Design a protein with these regions (language model features):
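SEC14/CRAL-TRIO lipid-binding/transfer domains and related phosphoinositide-recognition modules
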Residues: 2-129, 146
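Eukaryote-skewed repeat-based solenoidal scaffolds used as protein-protein interaction platforms
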Residues: 80-87, 91-94, 102-244
């Protein structure tokens, strides 16, 4: 998440204090500040209709609603590749670099109508990589749930996206997520990395133990030891294109 979300200059009180005409650079800086301010305002009330789980010693956790089994579309594609397309019979996923969908975090309301047109949408997947600052991992996990809950409250058909990092993250990673629900789990980018595969498998096992899902939408390569009897697999289109030289 390399994009700036808040710029202190937006409320630094300096507007109107200079007698000289502002330079083009100053005007540009102010415009950027106002845009940043708009982004903050666009998020300040999005959680008004979201329920929260109160957890001692933690911030309230957004509650994501349970999803019953339904007829799945045949194809799952990344947000950045389909958001401006008209094909509605798709499942939208956020399994791509954070920068490709950071705009959803910056201005969630803007994407309510575009996301509603699709058959279903798997919840956002902001990174929680090993080596990231612990607060950033927690924050990204929190916003993954918060945005999913927000879009559910707006009538978008959202699938809970289950994410984690290392075993320490289990203390919060699965909180607020529904039990006995359809869920989605991604494994993109870990095959061939034994440490990453080990951590993924441990988290997968814990997710199934805690959430006891009735159906798992799986994106990416099939991993050994999975519950294939309750899983439906979707191909990683980016990886497919890479393998085909496109």
């Amino acid at each position: 998440m390399g994009d700036t979300i808040f710029n202190p200059d937006f409320i630094d009180g300096s507007e109107g204090m200079h007698s000289e005409a502002p330079s083009p650079r100053t005007k540009k800086h102010r415009r950027a500040g106002y845009r940043t301010g708009d982004l903050v305002l666009n998020k300040q009330d999005i959680l008004d209709n979201v329920e929260f789980l109160t957890v001692p010693g933690q911030l309230p956790i957004p509650i994501v609603k349970r999803v019953e089994p339904f007829e799945l579309p045949l194809q799952a594609l990344p947000f950045s590749k389909v958001i401006n397309k008209d094909n509605k019979d798709l499942m939208v996923v956020f399994y791509e670099p954070d920068t490709n969908f950071a705009r959803v975090l910056h201005n969630p309301k803007r994407y309510v109508k575009p996301l509603k047109k699709f058959s279903c949408v798997v919840g956002p997947d902001f990174s929680q990589k090993i080596g990231m600052n612990e607060f950033m991992r927690y924050s990204n996990n929190w916003w993954n749930k918060a945005l999913t809950a927000f879009y559910q409250s707006q009538g978008v058909f959202m699938i809970p996206n289950v994410t984690w990092s290392d075993p320490a993250s289990y203390a919060y990673a699965f909180m607020g997520l529904p039990k006995h629900s359809v869920i989605a789990i991604n494994c993109t980018g870990i095959k061939g990395n034994h440490a990453a595969m080990y951590l993924w498998r441990k988290g997968y096992e814990e997710a199934l133990r805690v959430l006891d899902p009735i159906l798992i939408i799986r994106y990416g390569d099939k991993m050994s030891g999975e519950r294939e009897d309750i899983s439906i697999y979707f191909e990683n289109i980016n990886l497919k294109n890479l393998r085909n030289g496109r």
